[in-house]
Structure formats: C-alpha cells, structure tokens
UniProtKB/Swiss-Prot annotation:
Residue span, Protein kinase domain: 123-505
Native source species: Haemophilus ducreyi (strain 35000HP / ATCC 700724)
Keyword ATP-binding: yes
One protein family per Pfam: ABC1
EC number(s) stated in the UniProt entry for this protein: 2.7.-.-
Entry's localization field: Cell inner membrane
Active site: 291
Residue intervals passing through the bilayer: 506-526
Annotated positions binding ATP: 129-137, 156
Any single Gene Ontology cellular-component annotation: plasma membrane
InterPro entries: ABC1_dom (IPR004147), Kinase-like_dom_sf (IPR011009), UbiB (IPR010232), UbiB_bact (IPR045308), UbiB_kinase (IPR050154)
Transferase in keyword set: yes
Record family assignment: Belongs to the ABC1 family. UbiB subfamily.
Annotated protein name in UniProt: Probable protein kinase UbiB
Length: 542
C-alpha cells in the first residue's frame, strides 16, 4: 500500500512538472523547501512551454485520470475563484474513459444480485453502452419470468477498485491543499481544503448507487405526469450499493441541435421549459438535479411540438431551505430592480456575512459590479452570472461559503447554456419571473399565515393535548425551584452572618490579647468595665 501511494505521488508530481504547473510557486521564504524539491527533479522540465497555463493544467489533469478530471470539471464551475480563461479550459475536460471488461462487469453484477443474470434478464450486452470515471452501463431485458417481461433496462455498475483509487488521490489532494494558501493572497481565497472536502463528499456519494436510486425516485415522484420532465423508473429490488437497474430511455441528446430541428421540435418552448423545470425544482420542491449537463439530458422524440425533457444520472442533487430560497428570490428581484441596498441587507440578514458589515460599502460594491450588466438588454442577462457577481462581492465582505448555493449556481449556468444553445433568443427573466413572484407572494400576506397555521395544526393539536400536564409539571418545577432558592438564600445569609461574626471575633480577640498583655498596667476602674463588656458580647453571641 505504501509503495503504491509513493509511486502515485511521484506520478502526480512528475506530471505537474512536465506541464510546468510548478510555475505558480512564488519565490518566498515559505516555499523554499518546495522550490528546493523542484530542483531535485531537475530532469523533469516543462515540455509544453508554448502553451498557456490553462491549457497545460487541463492536459495535466486529463493525463492524471478520472479523479483529477472530475476535480477540474468541478473547479470549472467555480468562476468566482478563477480567471475566465482558466475556467474555460477546465470546462473542456471530458469525463469519458475506456470501459472495463464486460465479463468482469457481469461478475460484479451477479455477486451483487446473488445469482446469474439469466435468472432475471435476457440479452445482457457485455459491451458497455457508455462509460465514465465512476461507473459504466450495460443494457438488458427483463425475461419472461419477471412481472415486467420484455421491459428494456440499463444496469449501472461501479468500476472495480475505484474507491481505493479515489481515497488515495484525495489524500494527496489534501496534502497539496494545505500548501496552496501560502502561495499568495489570491490562493487563500480558494479555500483549497474546503474545495477538496466538498469534492470528496461528492465523489463518495457517487460511489453509493443507492443514493442515486433514492434521488431518482424522489425526482420522478416530484414530476409524475409532468409534460416538462420525465425521469426513468428505478427497480429497487435490483439495486445495491455498486449496482442499480433502471428503465432504459430513448431520447435525443439535448446538445444534438440538428436532430432536434430535423424532428420538428418546438425549440422556443423546449428552452423555456428547461428554465421552468429548474425553477420548479428550486422553489416548489426545494430539491434539484445538480448535474444537468448535456450528457445527462435528453429530449423525448415523440410529440416534438410539445417537447419533454428526460433526465438521468441523479447522483448529485442539491437541497434548499426557506432561507436559501428567500435569498435567491429576493436577491434576483432586488437585482433586476437595481435595489442594491436590499441585496446587501439580504446577505446580512441571512447570517452569511457578519452583522457588523458596513451596509453602505456593501451596497456600493454591489452597485459597482452589477450595474454594468444592465448595459445588455434584459433578455440577455445571465442569472448564473448575476449569482456569480453576488458571490464575488460577498466573499470580499467575508461571506461564508454556502455549498448548496454554489451547486445551484453551477446548475443554473448549465441550464442557461443549454437553453440558449437550443434557442439563442431565450428571455431568461421573463421565463423565470413568474416563479420568483409567485413564490414571494406565497411567503407574505394573509394566505401565507393561513398556510403556515394549517401546516402546523397537527403539532398544535399534539401539544395542546399535553398542555394541562405540561402546566402542572411546570408549576411543580417552579414550586421546587422556589423552595431551593429559599434554601439557598438561607444558606447564603447564614454564611454571610458567620463571616461577619468571624471578623468581629478576630477584632475582639485582638483587643483581648492586647488588653491581657497590658492588663497589669491598666487602672482597676478601666480594666473591670472592659472585661465585663467583652463577656457580655460573647454571651450574647452564644
């Protein structure tokens, strides 16, 4: 194991050096050891000096394999952290790798299901239909012994040993992430350790296909009988951590504009429905498919005049709470109304930026960054870019990273890109505005109060039944507390009295000692009254 990790570490270092990635190491005292180590690998020189840094980084990640490719893809969506040219290069990374042996896939599936494939399926194709870094898919058909006999299905299987590879590479990423903040002030903004932690969670979640199954079932239920989106059925009886079985779909890739056009698809309606599907997930369901790139989205070839999307691969999803949704809706509406003070206050009220933030400076920062956007026609404004600008400004005012909103912003950029690819004249604002306005209207006013009361009525009934007992218990507790407080006051008063008495006795004792010391020298008429008074004082105390 140690040998494998050492060899992998050398492979990663050598790859970065051959592509000149080490040029980002600044000449400062802290990096002396890193620069010295670089000289130790003197035979590994930059072989691609004619290429810009972004291209070299993309090629290096591509060579390092699936785990690093997916990291680059994730970083490509963080345009709040990278220059546009670098983000554009990372976006070109393709998560496609050669499939592993179909016979091995068969063996893994049979081990998971507990019997031979022929027990349930006919026509299992050992040639993978598609292959990616985490898993690959094969086709089959339910045999005559199954209730869904003849149904075409897809079997998705996790790559063997991929978990070990991921964990080993992630461990190395953490080591690199610890060094990055010391490179420059800009590098500190990257928060590299947080990025790696977020990436690790995403990858490990994708390794558990039961999560994907649960996500797909939930999304399918949310859009049951919908004319906008169809999600393939899952077959839970055949689903395990490393294998899932789902309905096979037949659709046109959303990026295949030529075929969509040839099929007579209503492109304007298709583009608008893409935006509607996204905002429905966000504001109605608080649960959204967060990996809606072109490879996971298809279009139903039937009834092209009334187009319907087909969504697959629900391994990555996002969830939002009421605070998140209010932030999104009010920020977008305030932005389009050019109410930058409201935008600033939204960030502070949400608790994502410090309460002592200078609101005037915050407002002016938003105005400076956002106002130039309105040089474009309203229809051409990108919601994803608006969110990106808001995040960029907020980070300057110490906004805490909100992973769910970063995921949403990435998904929104995907949706916008696909929508404008399908129909370049898509007016995002007019398409999204009804969803935003409807949701905001539902959050205020008498109807909102009635809705909240209705939702909480079962809790009220449950708590009301327990109300008499709760009151009695509270009174008993209060009675006990009052008794304990009274006892405590007596104890404290007694301690205070004792303390006062002790002080007095110390003083009296001192006087007695001094008198006894000089008793023989005192006249009789003075000695007797003093002794009498001291005796009376002692008797009174007793």
């Amino acid at each position: 194991m140690i040998f494998k990790n050492t060899r992998r570490s050398y492979q990663i270092i050598a790859t970065f050096l051959r592509y000149g990635i080490d040029e980002i190491i600044p000449d400062i005292p802290f990096t002396y050891s890193a620069r010295l180590t670089r000289k130790a690998f003197f035979w590994l020189q930059n072989e691609h000096k004619d290429q810009p840094f972004g291209v070299r980084l993309r090629l290096a990640l591509q060579e390092l394999g699936p785990v690093w490719i997916k990291l680059g893809q994730m970083l490509a969506t963080r345009r709040d952290l990278f220059e546009p040219a670098l983000a554009d290069q990372l976006a070109l990374l393709q998560d496609s790798v050669a499939p592993f042996d179909g016979k091995l896939a068969r063996k893994i599936i049979e081990q998971a299901l507990g019997n031979t494939l022929e027990t349930w399926f006919d026509d299992f194709d050992e040639q993978a239909l598609a292959s990616a870094s985490i898993a690959q898919v094969h086709t089959a058909t339910f045999n005559k012994n199954q209730p869904l006999a003849g149904q075409n299905v897809v079997l998705k299987v996790i790559r063997p040993d991929i978990e070990h590879i991921i964990k080993a590479d992630i461990a190395l990423m953490y080591q690199l992430a610890k060094l990055i903040p010391y490179l420059s002030d800009d590098a500190k903004r990257l928060r590299a350790t947080e990025v790696v932690r977020e990436y690790e969670k995403t990858l490990l979640d994708e390794l558990d296909l039961t999560r994907e199954m649960a996500n797909a079932i939930r999304l399918r239920n949310n859009f049951e009988n919908s004319e906008m989106l169809y999600v393939p059925a899952m077959y839970p009886d055949f689903c395990h951590k490393n294998v899932i079985v789902m309905e096979r779909i037949y659709g046109i890739p959303v990026s295949d504009i030529a075929t969509l056009t040839e099929n007579g698809t209503n492109m304007k309606l298709l583009a608008e429905r893409g935006v509607q599907v996204f905002f429905t997930q966000v504001f109605r369901d608080s649960f959204f498919h967060a990996d809606m790139h072109a490879g996971n989205i298809f279009v139903n070839p039937n009834h092209p005049e009334d187009p319907q999307y087909i969504g697959i691969d629900c391994g990555i999803v996002g969830t939002l709470n009421q605070n998140d949704k209010r932030y999104l809706a009010e920020s977008f509406v305030a932005f389009f109304n050019r109410d930058y003070r409201r935008v600033a206050l939204m960030h502070i009220e949400s608790g994502w930026t410090p309460a002592d933030t200078d609101v005037d400076a915050f407002e002016e920062a938003f105005r400076t960054v956002c106002e130039p956007i309105f040089a474009k026609p309203l229809a051409e404004i990108s919601f994803g870019q608006v969110l990106l600008n808001l995040f960029n400004v907020a980070r300057q005012f110490n906004m805490e990273v909100q992973p769910q909103l970063v995921l949403l912003q990435k998904t929104l950029l995907y949706i916008e890109g696909l929508g404008r690819q399908v129909y370049p004249a898509l007016d995002l604002w007019q398409t999204a505005k009804p969803f935003l306005q409807k949701w905001l209207d539902q959050q205020v006013g008498f109807k909102a109060i009635l809705r909240d009361l209705k939702q909480q009525a079962p809790q009220f009934r449950e708590h009301f039944a327990q109300f008499p007992e709760a009151v009695f218990n509270a009174l008993q507790q209060q009675k006990h507390i009052n008794y304990r407080l009274a006892e405590l006051n007596k104890t404290l008063q007694s301690q205070a009295d004792n303390k006062t008495y002790n002080v007095k006795m110390i003083i009296m004792g001192s006087i007695i000692l001094s008198l006894l010391w000089q008793f023989n020298s005192l006249p009789l008429w003075l000695s007797l009254p003093i002794l009498t008074m001291l005796c009376l004082a002692l008797c009174r105390r007793k």
